Amino acid sequence: LIRFLRFVSLLFGCALILVSLTADLTGLSVGSGFSRNQWLILCMGLFAIIGGILGAAFAKLYRRTAIMLLNLLILLVVLDISALVVVKLIDADRFRLRQRKLDAGGVHLLHDNVVERYVPFVLWRAVPDTVMAGATTDGEGFRITPPSTVRSDGDTLYLYAFGGSAMWGYGVDDTCTIAFYLQQELASGLERPVRVSNRAQCAQASTQELIELLLQLRAGNVPDIVLFYDGFNDVASAYESGIAGAHLGLRSIEGRIEGDPRAMGRIPLAEDVFRRTNFFLFLGSIGLVSSEANPLPPESYMDHGVSLDSLADDVVSIYLGNTTVATKLSEAYGFAVYFVLQPNIWCGSKPLSACELGFRNGSAAGAFQPGEDENWRNLIRRCYLVWADSISNQGRIFDYSDAFDTCEYPVYTDGCGAHITAAGNRMIAARLADDIMPEDSLEYSENSSPSD
């Protein structure tokens, strides 16, 4: 009987190996290449053959192997629990960030502390009703501008502020954003209630903001003034994709739609399991691994064979096209609209601190990855030069690239090169108020109160 069972085991193992090797030819495999299931069947076949060869000795080998694997499993569990304790002690923010991503459905993370969710047409907004390191969002995912309750009557001036993370207020509290300071400046200058609604979103470009404005107008939310604060993200999206007018993360989203395994986050099972462990969080906390799973290799417009001058011209042309559409909407709906090209660390003549020099050159810790790329620096400077020539005769488009030229103290807060301090936000808000302050305090009073 023992010989018969060994023979059956050998025969069964050979059959399994044959099935795994011929699965593509026999139609048992739906894909091409050697799939995960084929590897599993192959291992089962080898396991059966080993059992057939060893016979009675296989039981002893199996028992010893099982005990060894059980001890290894216990060791891994203890190691993972220990890693969890260490991470909570030395890097609690990393653990809380991962939990916020899981609670939000775990989809999109564009900035270290800002979790986004998918929204039709504009692609993403911050997760609604969330408090993240001093940043509060409302039920729609928009940044709150304190005080959240302002008298809503016919005398209140409503302003919608659109932009990317600089207008959103990345890195500062709710009471230190451009929107907050602008609300104070206008209320003081006009001596009437002012409500500045921060409609900016991290990493959004001007075309996404224009679509957001359309959605607000369609919903019946018509403000008195609309402000667009842009420049950096329009250039950054063109830099990484070689396509003017694109949004950031184009290749990743494009890859998901077209089934690119890397863009869809498909990674080997073993790596996926490892990345879900607390030990992986620990390795990330001490800088030994990256939190990005199998990232797509970085590219720039040069990799796509796009010339600097033509891309810069296209970026400016599309931006100006967006300003034309927004102006037409303002005429149709009866609101005033203004456009501002935001300051950045690569343009203008600001005296830079040692830390800011590191941000500009891409050499500081956490610096904007393309910052050290000469192609990036050339593109953003070229775009701003073309913008300056194109907007010289347009009264409601302002170039703020010189906003900090006389500022001796540090303003830029991180390697992005566009995020600024609370003091910098106050300076921008004061200049905005001077540029858009109506001569008549009742000049903007025709629209009904929009939704906040």
Which residues does each PLM region occupy?
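Serine-dependent acyl-ester chemistry module
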Residues: 13-27, 233-389, 405-410
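Internal/C-terminal transmembrane anchor helices
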Residues: 61-87
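Membrane-embedded alpha-helical segments of integral membrane proteins
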Residues: 8-55
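Catalytic cores of nucleotide-enabled group-transfer and carboxylate-activating enzymes in metabolic
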Residues: 55, 59, 178, 182, ...
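Conserved SGNH/GDSL esterase-like catalytic core that processes O-acyl groups on lipids
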Residues: 130, 158-160, 166-269
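Membrane-interfacial loop-to-transmembrane alpha-helix junctions, especially the N-terminal start
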Residues: 2-13, 62-68
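Membrane/wall-proximal cationic-aromatic binding patches
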Residues: 91-185, 189-190, 404-408, 452
